[in-house]
């Protein structure tokens, strides 16, 4: 795995690449296009594989929930945009993706994967990296899975909601926090209000 330039609390590495858009067209997109929005940017190893379609379809199926949070989901792999399109045009029952609600970026030179520190150099593919970038372009969360295990859309959605809550209210979110749950005031005295309610 490459070290990359992606660091929590710093600007997310910029990228510009060709993507297959939800309407099936090719378009060059960049991270800068989504300024003012949260972005969930995830890498997957390869098109036409086994775990990857389950993750991509799960994120695509729930794209509207992210959109309601002013958050854009973007997928990326080292495959060409032509390969992405062929996979999208393959029926789900045959291992394809079917119609997508999110853009899929092509990173054939592996520069984006390298910048984000997810390149598995010996195979020339990406680990399952997931990055939450806030509306100011700051990287707030990084997870990188080894190849065999997929990621949770529910947990990603929860993290976006939690970061947005802390941005807006200045309070911090305890383990397992969900919208509507108690939060903690980041102050020695005021935090006792939260802890006094715990069993």
UniProtKB/Swiss-Prot annotation:
Write out the annotated subcellular location: Cytoplasm
So what does this thing catalyse?
a hydroperoxide + [thioredoxin]-dithiol = an alcohol + [thioredoxin]-disulfide + H2O
Positions carrying N6-succinyllysine: 35
Q: Which intervals of the chain are annotated as region Disordered?
A: 176-199
SUPFAM superfamilies in the record, alphabetically? Thioredoxin-like
What does the function comment of this entry state? Thiol-specific peroxidase that catalyzes the reduction of hydrogen peroxide and organic hydroperoxides to water and alcohols, respectively. Plays a role in cell protection against oxidative stress by detoxifying peroxides and as sensor of hydrogen peroxide-mediated signaling events. Might participate in the signaling cascades of growth factors and tumor necrosis factor-alpha by regulating the intracellular concentrations of H(2)O(2). Reduces an intramolecular disulfide bond in GDPD5 that gates the ability to GDPD5 to drive postmitotic motor neuron differentiation.
Q: What is this protein called?
A: Peroxiredoxin-1
Lineage of the organism: Eukaryota, Metazoa, Chordata, Craniata, Vertebrata
């Amino acid at each position: 795995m490459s070290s990359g330039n992606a660091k929590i609390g710093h600007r997310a590495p910029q990228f510009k690449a060709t993507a297959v858009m939800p309407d099936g067209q090719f378009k060059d997109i960049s991270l800068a296009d989504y300024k003012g929005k949260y972005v969930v940017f995830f890498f997957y190893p390869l098109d036409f594989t086994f775990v990857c379609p389950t993750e991509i379809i799960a994120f695509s199926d729930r794209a509207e929930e992210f959109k309601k949070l002013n958050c854009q989901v973007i997928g990326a792999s080292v495959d060409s945009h032509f390969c992405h399109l062929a996979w999208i045009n393959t029926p789900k029952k045959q291992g394809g993706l079917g119609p997508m609600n999110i853009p899929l970026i092509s990173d054939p030179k592996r520069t984006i994967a390298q910048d984000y520190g997810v390149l598995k150099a010996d195979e020339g593919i990406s680990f399952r990296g997931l990055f939450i970038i806030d509306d100011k372009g700051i990287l707030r969360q990084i997870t990188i899975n080894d190849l065999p295990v997929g990621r949770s859309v529910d947990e990603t959605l929860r993290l976006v909601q939690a970061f947005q809550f802390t941005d807006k209210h200045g309070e911090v979110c305890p383990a397992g926090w969900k919208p509507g749950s108690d939060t903690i005031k980041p102050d020695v005295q005021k935090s006792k209000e939260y802890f006094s309610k715990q069993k």
